[in-house]
């Protein structure tokens, strides 16, 4: 959520920043509601003071011997009752204005940092660096979905029978390979200082509102009809909300969390795109990284977050590039974001496998997540960061293509081998599909 004081003090600056994102926002209405609410608050406080004064006056008169049922005391009590009724009306109207204002504020995306490149869409993102050789192979490379089915790593038709389209079932060596990837990712991140969490896979509406998925992206999520619970679209939601409505001692910052979870997305706007394979599914596996930091640390922690995600791609020997997202391509909650895009030889292009975002205090304001400096009064909002470390299905898909050998076998990268059962690993380091 944006700082309301910033909107009051520098509305044009906020308007220009939102325009860079291509966001449509009724700032004038928000400021109008805020102004009316503050006027009512001023009036209510004055009436409350008057009511308190009347109460004291009545008490004083009675102590001085006035008749409690007399005309003077009765008139003052009636005046006090009228004031209380007016105060109650003002409080009700204040709540209505506050509710409408908060509803509008929740629809506003985060403001991009001044350093973010200005652009309209992904075509204007800026490449930062590359790693590995993204070369067109000298031998034919099957798309990952074809080689996976050929090797018996996944079941598509039977998964669709159990659920619907955009679901798959990993089986045999495919399941073992996915499990090995998850274990490798978690072990690397734990070694880098992250605390592993197994969070709830169902969260309430307040949690989704805290990280910015609600109200804007309700149509993208799966909801349990009889409960205020949603299947998580990413572990970012439960991890970031672990400390919601709490005050963290500043000396405990930064906090690092990692989690493996299944993730669930309706993909309502992706009809006809990536209909085969592991790229775009309703249910997919992901290892997520979340940081809760002091504001002075967040930019440095953002760069470390990107490096932590990059480390997995390097361990898997997968060519990739780092891209900074332009203003028009930023996620709703992000103030700055770097995407990691892994190379897919069959498509002759890079595809996103991780988004590493610095949300500044945007999510913290929505979740009321604060810190307190020792020996100082007051609290301040933390900064939150998140990134995929990595999307497991896409990592597996990229591995099947980039390490596909001329004979059709799949070479398992050295760093992954200790996590894969020897039943599925041949002596020359290739994936064995029939142990």
Swiss-Prot record:
HAMAP family (alphabetical): Ser_tRNA_synth_type1
Signal sequence segment: none
Binding site for ATP: 265-267, 352-355
Entry EC number(s): 6.1.1.11
Keyword ATP-binding: yes
Source superkingdom: Bacteria
UniProt cross-references to Pfam families, sorted A to Z: Seryl_tRNA_N, tRNA-synt_2b
GO terms of biological process kind: selenocysteine biosynthetic process; seryl-tRNA aminoacylation
Broad class of enzyme this protein falls into: ligase
Key words, A-Z: Aminoacyl-tRNA synthetase, ATP-binding, Cytoplasm, Ligase, Nucleotide-binding, Protein biosynthesis
Pathway as given in its UniProt record: Aminoacyl-tRNA biosynthesis; selenocysteinyl-tRNA(Sec) biosynthesis; L-seryl-tRNA(Sec) from L-serine and tRNA(Sec): step 1/1
Name of protein: Serine--tRNA ligase
Record GO terms (molecular function): ATP binding; serine-tRNA ligase activity
Reactions the enzyme catalyzes: tRNA(Ser) + L-serine + ATP = L-seryl-tRNA(Ser) + AMP + diphosphate + H(+); tRNA(Sec) + L-serine + ATP = L-seryl-tRNA(Sec) + AMP + diphosphate + H(+)
UniProt similarity note: Belongs to the class-II aminoacyl-tRNA synthetase family. Type-1 seryl-tRNA synthetase subfamily.
Record's GO cellular component terms: cytoplasm
Gene3D superfamilies in the cross-refs: Bira Bifunctional Protein, Domain 2 (3.30.930.10), Serine-tRNA synthetase, tRNA binding domain (1.10.287.40)
Residues that hold L-serine according to the record: 234-236, 288, 388
Subcellular location(s) of the protein: Cytoplasm
Function of the protein: Catalyzes the attachment of serine to tRNA(Ser). Is also able to aminoacylate tRNA(Sec) with serine, to form the misacylated tRNA L-seryl-tRNA(Sec), which will be further converted into selenocysteinyl-tRNA(Sec).
Domain topic, free-text comment: Consists of two distinct domains, a catalytic core and a N-terminal extension that is involved in tRNA binding.
Subunit structure, interactors included: Homodimer. The tRNA molecule binds across the dimer.
């Amino acid at each position: 959520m944006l700082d309301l004081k910033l909107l009051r003090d520098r509305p044009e600056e906020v308007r220009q920043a939102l325009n860079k994102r291509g966001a449509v926002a009724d700032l004038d209405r928000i400021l109008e509601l805020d102004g009316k609410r503050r006027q009512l608050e001023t009036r209510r406080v004055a009436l409350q003071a008057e009511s308190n004064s009347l109460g004291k006056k009545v008490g004083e008169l009675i102590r001085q011997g006035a008749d409690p049922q007399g005309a003077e005391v009765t008139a003052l009590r009636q005046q006090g009752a009228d004031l209380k009724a007016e105060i109650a009306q003002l409080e009700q109207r204040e709540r209505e204005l506050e509710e409408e204002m908060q509803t509008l504020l929740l629809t506003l995306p985060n403001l991009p940092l001044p350093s973010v490149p200005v652009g309209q869409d992904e075509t204007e993102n800026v490449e930062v660096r590359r790693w590995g050789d993204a070369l067109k192979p000298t031998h034919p490379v099957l798309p990952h979905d074809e080689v996976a089915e050929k090797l018996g790593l996944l079941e598509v038709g039977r998964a669709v029978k159990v659920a619907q389209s955009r679901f798959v079932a990993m089986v045999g060596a495919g399941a073992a390979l996915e499990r090995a990837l998850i274990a490798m990712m978690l072990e690397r991140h734990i070694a880098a200082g992250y605390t592993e969490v197994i969070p709830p896979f169902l969260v309430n509406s307040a949690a989704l509102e805290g990280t910015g998925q609600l109200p804007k992206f309700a149509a993208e999520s799966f909801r349990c009809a009889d409960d205020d619970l949603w299947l998580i679209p990413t572990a970012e939601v439960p991890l970031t909300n672990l400390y919601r409505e709490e005050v963290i001692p500043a000396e405990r910052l930064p906090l690092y969390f990692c989690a493996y979870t299944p993730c669930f997305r309706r993909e309502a706007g992706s009809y006809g795109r990536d209909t085969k394979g592991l790229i775009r599914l309703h249910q997919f596996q992901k290892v997520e990284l979340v940081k809760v930091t002091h504001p002075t640390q967040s930019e440095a922690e953002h760069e470390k977050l990107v490096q932590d995600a990059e480390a997995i791609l390097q361990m898997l020997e997968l060519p990739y590039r780092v891209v900074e997202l332009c203003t028009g391509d930023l996620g709703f909650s992000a103030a700055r974001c770097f995407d990691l895009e892994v190379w897919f030889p069959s498509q002759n292009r890079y595809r996103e496998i991780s988004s590493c975002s610095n949300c500044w205090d945007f999510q913290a304001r929505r979740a009321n997540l604060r810190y307190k400096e020792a020996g100082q009064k007051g609290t301040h909002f933390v900064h939150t960061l998140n990134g995929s470390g990595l999307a497991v299905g896409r990592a597996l898909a990229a591995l099947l293509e980039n390490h596909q050998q001329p004979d059709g076998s799949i070479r398992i990268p050295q760093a992954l081998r200790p996590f894969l059962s020897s039943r599925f690993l041949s002596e020359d380091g290739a994936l064995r599909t029939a142990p």
